[in-house]
Amino acid sequence: MKSYEVNFDGLVGPTHNYGGLSYGNVASQSNSQQASNPREAARQGLAKMKALADMGFKQGVLAPQERPDVAALRRLGFSGSDADVIQRAAREAMPLLVASCSASSMWVANAATVSPSADTADGRVHFTAANLNCKYHRSIEHPTTSRVLGAMFNNEKHFAHHAALPAVAQFGDEGAANHTRFCRAYGEAGVEFFVYGRSAFDSRYPAPQKYPARQTLEASQAVARLHGLSDDGVVYAQQNPAVIDQGVFHNDVISVGNGEVLFYHEEAFLETDAVLGQLRAKLASKGGNFQAICVPRAAVAVEDAVRSYLFNSQLLSRDDGSMLLVVPEECRNNERVWAYLGQLTSQGGPVKEVKVFDLKQSMQNGGGPACLRLRVALKEAELAAVNQGVIMTAPLYDTLLQWVDRHYRDRLGEADLADPQLLVECRTALDELTQILKLGSVYPFQRQP
């Protein structure tokens, strides 16, 4: 049976704005309070989805969340009508309103961790929604994330869904942004690679000093248990705390893996040789030939990697066995990074081509190509069991473009978030979107009695 890696990209929501909410994310902080263009952001994301689908890659869409999150504001003591809640929050606690309007769910690499059926004890694809408890604006996402994933992968024979881990710092979980998988073929058993920033209960592990380590070892271990993964199919690695302090807030900012290949920066991990040795040995036991591509600091400094998002790229397998690296425009604009990529594609390794996309609206908030997608390896029967309304096609692309143009503003500043009409616009748009994507009632406003 054939198997595929399907990339489900997050559709940018109508409240896309630059709130500067993500401490430790250099781009998010440095572009705080700029005016955003939600319509352009959504169109940029859709253009990437359509281009990759046109190239033959399997591509899906993951819906955005209801924002502003009025229910979250009510839990914080704001009362009255929805308009009252928004306007009072704007007067008394603008940072809370900004957080409740965040469109950060577009970065669906943080939506969940996914284990393919070939790796799990019960032979189903497993999903665990990420609690994202390090940042308030993201910690409110997982209930809707779980409902959306449940509506997309809604066949119990093939798919198992787990609730987010306990929402405490000891189990901080950032989803697939700190997880990748190596395999000879997508439908065969592979090795799942969990990267953490600190240990919650063992003080012998080092930790960053400036920025928070968002993923704990204990969270990664819990997800592996929930998914029924075997010890011979899992490797845990600690991210280098020094690079977290340089703005590498998730592992997908310093490495990317696919198939049998890990593309990583020299400074990405602690005890790199031991980590690579485990990956090589465990993948070999499953018939695979692990290949590591190390980018030396002499070629690309960590600062350049963070600024360009070289590693927040998509490493995609072509039918001929070669790989394509999808990078943001910022890589072409960085002289050192672009020179390195020229060498990479000409030296006879697996990466044969680099494709550049303009994702500036997302990049200015600290999210590149890899942030925008959740990878799900599926066998043919599993892909057929996915809600087909979310699979990217030419007609769906056209429908979504028209939907965006109808409902999205082309400029959004902080003051606009206090406009109750924005909530009406968002709910109208999302109500229509659930019909387009055949999701049913996944949003809180659709579920109210």
UniProtKB/Swiss-Prot annotation:
It is an enzyme of class 3 (hydrolase). Its EC number is 3.5.3.23. GO terms for biological process: arginine catabolic process to glutamate; arginine catabolic process to succinate. Pfam families: AstB. It catalyses: N(2)-succinyl-L-arginine + 2 H2O + 2 H(+) = N(2)-succinyl-L-ornithine + 2 NH4(+) + CO2. Keywords: Arginine metabolism, Hydrolase. Residues 23-43 are annotated as: Disordered. Residues 27-37 have a biased composition (Low complexity). Signal peptide: none annotated. Pathway: Amino-acid degradation; L-arginine degradation via AST pathway; L-glutamate and succinate from L-arginine: step 2/5. The keyword Aminoacyl-tRNA synthetase does not apply. Disulfide bonds: none annotated. The active site is at residues 174, 250, 371. Substrate binds at residues 19-28, 110, 137-138, 214, 252, 365. SUPFAM superfamilies: Pentein. GO terms for molecular function: N-succinylarginine dihydrolase activity. InterPro entries: AstB_sf (IPR037031), SuccinylArg_d-Hdrlase_AstB (IPR007079). Belongs to the succinylarginine dihydrolase family. Catalyzes the hydrolysis of N(2)-succinylarginine into N(2)-succinylornithine, ammonia and CO(2). Homodimer. NCBIfam families: arg_catab_astB, PRK13281.1. This is N-succinylarginine dihydrolase. It comes from Pseudomonas putida (strain ATCC 700007 / DSM 6899 / JCM 31910 / BCRC 17059 / LMG 24140 / F1). The gene is astB.
